[in-house]
Regions:
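Conserved N-terminal phosphate-binding loop of PLP-dependent enzymes in the Aspartate aminotransferase
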Residues: 1-188
């Protein structure tokens, strides 16, 4: 970053890499990246579409390291799955760079979506869903870890809160992992 600071506008990161296999970064990675962004005047942009709103055992995944992103991207869980909602959040220092008429969106400013998101976030708070995800995630990883010790089916479990991955001992050509997913679906 030091060599190219003049050409880097920001650093976009999923606090926990989701689709690639639920990879949790080493402790201090996010706070270190945020510090580098501050040092070189680059925006720290957190993509919390998959990790945000209580899923990882905190309100946001960046909260595990007390990192405040310059820009926060949310979706999916912000409405509790009730209504399609997404948001890009930043403070005035960032948002006021965009002048009226410079940016538009197809469904922007939807009052129903905003009301649904507000209520869903209140439920997350009132029902302590982040704390529940942290507790249940610990139980899940312990139980799967114990199962791994006695089974040859799974080899590893990783994650935070209720965002987890279980690595299946299989080949790429096999359908074992898919069949396990179908069995889990069929059994609730």
């Amino acid at each position: 970053l030091a060599e190219n600071a003049a050409t880097v506008a920001g650093f976009l990161v999923e606090p926990i890499q989701g689709e690639a296999g639920v990879y949790v970064p080493s402790e201090g990675y996010l706070s270190g990246a945020k510090a580098l962004c501050e040092r070189y005047n680059a925006l720290f942009i957190a993509d919390e579409v998959q990790t945000g709103v209580a899923r990882t055992g905190k309100r946001l995944a960046v909260d595990h390291e007390n990192v405040k992103p310059d820009i926060l991207v949310l979706g999916k869980a912000i409405s509790g799955g009730v209504y399609p909602v997404s948001a890009v959040l930043a403070d005035d220092r960032i948002m006021h760079v965009i002048k009226a008429g410079q940016h538009g969106s197809t469904f922007g400013g939807n009052p129903l979506a905003a009301a649904v998101a507000i209520e869903a976030l209140q439920v997350v708070k009132d029902e302590q869903l982040a704390e529940n995800a942290a507790r249940l995630g610990e139980i899940f990883r312990k139980e799967i870890g114990d199962y791994i010790k006695i089974s040859k089916i799974a080899t590893l479990v990783r994650g935070k809160g209720l965002l987890n991955a279980v690595v299946i001992n299989d080949t790429e050509e096999s359908d074992t992992a898919w069949n396990i997913c179908l069995k889990m679906r069929d059994n609730g």
